Regions:
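Short alpha-helical segment within the catalytic ATP-binding CA
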Residues: 120
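Ferredoxin-type iron-sulfur electron-transfer modules and their immediate structural context
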Residues: 1-108
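Glycine-rich Rossmann-fold phosphate-binding loop(s) that bind the pyrophosphate
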Residues: 112-117
């Protein structure tokens, strides 16, 4: 990939707007591994910063694509679509298995919000 200095995983708030991925996904790393046809490494890089890519890839506003330096001269890298395909492939190939319910432990929790932070 010809990113130069990538801003897609930057996740920086500048004047009230987020530039790049607010989850700080390692977009250049997993996109590069995807280009090199390394599915295990691609998945590993994606899961390093994002515990729920199966959800976030569907609701993502693709701020990484808006910050993509490739988009200055060409179309930006389709990181949102790539993230979706990576996780779908991982489930299809058995690289990820659904986690089993650990059962009740007697503790109570409150979840505030329905976004990625609430899920974590």
């Amino acid at each position: 990939m010809n990113c130069g200095i990538p801003y897609c995983g930057f996740g920086k708030n500048i004047e009230g707007m987020t530039v790049g991925c607010p989850l700080h996904n390692l977009c250049p790393e997993f996109n590069d591994a995807l280009c090199k046809n390394q599915p295990e490494l691609t998945l590993k890089r994606l899961l390093k910063t994002n515990p729920f890519p199966e959800f976030t890839s569907r609701v993502c506003p693709a701020l990484c694509e808006k910050a993509c330096v490739e988009g200055l001269n060409f179309k930006p890298v389709t990181t949102k679509d790539n993230e979706y395909e990576i996780i779908e492939y991982a489930f299809e190939q058995g690289l990820i298995k659904a986690k089993k319910d650990i059962g009740k432990n007697g503790k109570k929790v409150v979840v505030v919000g329905s976004g990625p932070a609430g899920l974590a």
